[in-house]
Amino acid sequence: MSDSVIAAPALDVLHGRHSSKWRRFPEDVLPMHVAEMDFQLAQGIRERLIKMVSESDLGYTGPVPEVGDAFEGFAKDRWNWKIDKSQLKLVTDVGVGVVEFLRANGLANGKVIINSPVYHGFWEWLGELNIQTVDVPLAPDYELDIDGIEKQFAGGVKFLLLCNPQNPVGKAFSRAQLTELARVAKKHDAVVISDEIHAPLTYEDHEFTPYLNCGPDAEAT
């Protein structure tokens, strides 16, 4: 992540915006959502949106192969991660992707491991399917409790919802620890769902490792 300073709009401008972030709270509250940081859109995105609106190009969205092409290059450049574009599926947001994956795998009314402290949305997403959250908290140094996770896998819980980099503590789990997680998941025929949406925010002196870039066990789980 660059150390360059990027100015945000003035507060009076922000309070005039229409997003939930700026309408939900009174004016004496300064919301600081990581996922909505109020910086100006990149010039290329602004130009494309303006072009689409001016041409009324607003119909239903079908397959968008350009997204796969863009992500393939991005993942290779950032993390040396070679992806299979045929496996990419577009969803409206991370929560929808997680919920529908679990629904498709028959997890309604089942159990899923999470690692607190973690993004509050995890409880909301799993609640949509009446899924029981099995909390295996992070260790005091914010590392994953691999032994605790394996104990739950051995007890019959077959899904883990991972947050990496971890929200809210900002921990980017090491390749060694993710590889060990993949090993125990493979051993117990479990599945890891990795929410990696904040990966591009990793500081330059830290390394983000995609779960699927951690060897055959990760690819199998």
Region spans (language model):
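Walker B catalytic acidic pair
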Residues: 196
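N-terminal small-domain helix-loop-helix segment of the aminotransferase-like
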Residues: 2-94, 100
